[in-house]
Amino acid sequence: MVDLAKTLAAKGKLVYQGKPISAEDSLKSGIAPYIPSSELVNAVNLAIFLEKRPLLLKGEPGCGKTRLAEAVAYELGLPLVTWYIKSTSRARDGLYTYDAVKRLHDAQLVRIGKESQANVDNLDEYINKGALGEAFENKQRTVVLIDEIDKADIDFPNDLLRELDEQKFTIDETGKPIEAKHPPIVFITSNDEKDLPDAFLRRCLFHYVKFPENQLANIVKAHFSQSSETLIKAAVNKFMELRKQMEKGKAGKKASTSELLDWFAVLQQFPEDEILQELESKIPFPEILLKKWEDHLRYLKYEA
């Protein structure tokens, strides 16, 4: 594969290399270790270089889509703003919101002499910037995460097209134009709850975050550096044994990387020999990995 990071770095461009975060740095910063594939590193650098193209990330829930933005911001030393999408979210919310209720309340205070008319007339006081609005106004390049865009109304992605493409917008209430001082690095995640419009997809870069089967032991080790290789290997093997059974059984929800990490966090609390013995015959603490009763019946051996 062409090494885009190396090529861009040689030209003095900003690049993401996917450097591992040490356990010590993780504890200090609160940033979880993240081990990206080389393909994902390339996709991130495309988004950084092309500037006006957000990177759309798809993949199984729990595969690390959301954590990527955090890891990129940490490595590059850039601020991160996050916009968690809900079914009620509107595209304008990511730019700004206008607090009409507060202004009405303040107008009532003017009548009784507890607020000045000048303050109420200053509409800027009632404007709150959203994630994109904040990123546009930041004095340095900013990483923006738009999380789970597929939760919103079908028109939501298209309503963002102009602002993402032109890197500017106008506050309707004041007529004030806002233009990006530095183009943000935008990551958008989707769990495929609904299809996204073609017009929106054409303006995005796309990467599917694959389940990191070959990296699982390294991922666990990065999070639990004090644990032994023996325990990590045994836990990962048991986890993959379960996951392959779920794939064969066509389970709608397969155990994910994030659940593996939760599971291992519990396993390591016990004496190693005790857990190793348990792992030989069964799945300890299945509640962490199996989220439906049918899965418990299908993948666990219950005694009569």
Describe the predicted segments one by one.
Residues 1-304:
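C-terminal regulatory/interaction module of P-loop NTP-utilizing enzymes
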